[in-house]
Amino acid sequence: MERADNTYVQLCGRFVVELHGRRVDQRFPSRQGRPLFAYLVLQRPRAVGRDELVEALWPSDPPAGHAAALTVLLSKLRAALGADILEGRGTVRAALPPGARIDVEQALVSLHRAQSAVVQGEWARAWSGALCARYVTERPLLPGLEDLPWLEVWRRRLEDALDDALEAYAAACLGLGGTEIAGAERAARRLVEHNPLRETGYKLLMQTLAERGNVAEALGVYERARIVLRDELGISPGPAIHDFHAELLGR
């Protein structure tokens, strides 16, 4: 029996599909093969109706004969993957082997574990989980494909996941201390840059700078946060960042 753990799907960054250790994505049909397969994979384990697949591939202007075009696409995709990977006719399901690894799924699971570990103060476990999530979410989902609403929804979800992963990674590095403080600062700076309206990024950056003895710079970060939040949202910094700012002033 072939090992399921040799089956891997990479949707972020370079598109890769390996079945039992063998690359098959080069055999995918035309430009539509990638989004069709990706949509089915991201819907797992749900079976997807043909009308939904047409909407996923051609959201604004389905071609004439789109039902036949979808049938041809599915046939070619089955030829590339093997008939057992795409189950069903009226509805279609991606039936990857048990234990198959999909980068997006792995990132979201790793992120959840990292966030749980942060809450529990298990810094090493949080660090590894957040790093795994960052590795995937820092790369674009299906680059080169545009104008697909479902893809934009998933991209926004992964953008949010990247924010969460950066936050968990910075917190884990702070918890570990020592040489990891530099990593905490880099992650916090990246979070502030990526989402300047997220207060936790500023607090983590202030904490890392204070930990390294740069209290004046940490106070400057608070001022930056105050101005951004005031100008963009019309609010003041929340209690967590405000209280840490007061603590720094008392040092």
Region spans (language model):
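Short acidic, hydrophobic short linear motifs in intrinsically disordered regions
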Residues: A47-A56
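Glycine-centered, phosphate/nucleic-acid-interacting loop/turn motifs that mediate DNA/RNA or nucleotide
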Residues: L81
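Intrinsically disordered, charged and Pro/Gly-enriched terminal/linker segments
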Residues: D25-Q32, Y39-P45, W58-A68, V72, ...
